[in-house]
């Protein structure tokens, strides 16, 4: 049996779930997901969210296990009865086209969790000719030494490019600091739903994307068909302890990357 540890926010949970599905395909053994990380209160809160989506996440049951970290080789695992994977696994090379298509279907919020306000926004966005999701990540990034907070200049460049190539663009702003966004942006729609998973579903409904250095908007853009995606060319403030490899993985899709310098 394969056991994948779930931890972090929604974007990280999606990466860990997808990696588990990849491991299941490669090994031919079932995957289970360890959700114990969410049994502890954290600041800021990072609730378990995969139960809101269309995928089926199996519970775990094991007595002995070997922890496998991201730096370890997967080649020597065949003889282990129970393998426990601990990491974020943020690498799109894990997903072949068949798995990616399945993830596109599974990474939708179950309709039983849709609210009236969400449904109204969803229907409006789907009718928009060129709905563009713009994601601003601030929040915990403001107080973390390694996280890079994107400047308003980045978004100005991205918006100028989108407005030059898309007819009648309609901008929908998603953020964990919506008040800051209201001070910066004009002639846009501000999405203020409290549930992150519903914001993610609305973001997926958009046709094009201006993403932040965040797994949340990365996934919304990565799952889209034929979208124009603008992303920052730098993911982290520092490039230490393997972060340059992580950054290269996150910036591997064929998108337009804006130089932050």
Where are these regions (language model features)?
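N-terminal pre-catalytic "stem/leader" segment of glycosyltransferase-like enzymes
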Residues: 1-40
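Secretory-pathway luminal glycosyltransferase catalytic domains
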Residues: 36-166, 251-254
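Aromatic-acidic/polar surface patches that form glycan- and anion
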Residues: 5-13, 144-151, 202, 213
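Short hydrophobic beta-strand segments
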Residues: 1-6, 30-34, 129-142, 172-173, ...
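Structural alpha-beta junctions
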Residues: 25-30, 55-56, 157-169, 187-190
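Donor-binding and catalytic core of enzymes assembling or modifying cell-surface/extracellular glycoconjugates
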Residues: 10, 163-247
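Leloir-type glycosyltransferase catalytic cores
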Residues: 113-115, 239-261
């Amino acid at each position: 049996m394969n056991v994948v540890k779930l931890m972090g926010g929604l974007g990280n949970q999606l990466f860990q779930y997808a990696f588990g599905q990849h491991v299941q395909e490669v090994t031919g053994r079932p995957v289970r997901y360890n959700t114990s990380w969410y049994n502890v209160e954290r600041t800021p809160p990072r609730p378990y969210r995969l139960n809101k989506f269309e995928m089926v996440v199996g519970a775990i049951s094991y007595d002995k296990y070997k922890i496998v970290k991201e730096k370890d080789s997967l080649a020597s695992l065949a003889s282990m009865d129970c393998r426990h994977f601990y990491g974020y696994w943020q690498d799109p090379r894990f997903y072949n086209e068949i798995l990616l298509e399945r993830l596109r279907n599974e990474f939708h919020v179950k309709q039983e969790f849709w609210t009236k306000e969400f449904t109204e926004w969803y229907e409006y966005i789907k009718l928009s000719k060129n709905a563009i999701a713009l994601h601003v990540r601030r929040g915990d990034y403001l107080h973390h030494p390694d996280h890079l907070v994107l400047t308003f200049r980045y978004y100005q460049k991205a918006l100028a490019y989108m407005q030059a190539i898309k007819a009648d663009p309609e901008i929908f702003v998603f953020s964990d600091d919506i008040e800051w966004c209201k001070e910066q942006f004009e002639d846009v729609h501000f999405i203020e739903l409290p549930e992150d998973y519903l914001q993610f579903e609305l973001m997926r409904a958009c046709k094009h994307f201006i993403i932040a250095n965040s797994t949340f908007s990365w996934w919304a853009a990565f799952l889209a068909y034929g979208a124009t995606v603008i992303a920052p060319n730098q993911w982290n403030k520092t490039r230490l302890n393997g972060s340059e490899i992580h950054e290269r993985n996150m910036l591997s899709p064929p998108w337009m990357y804006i130089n932050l310098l």
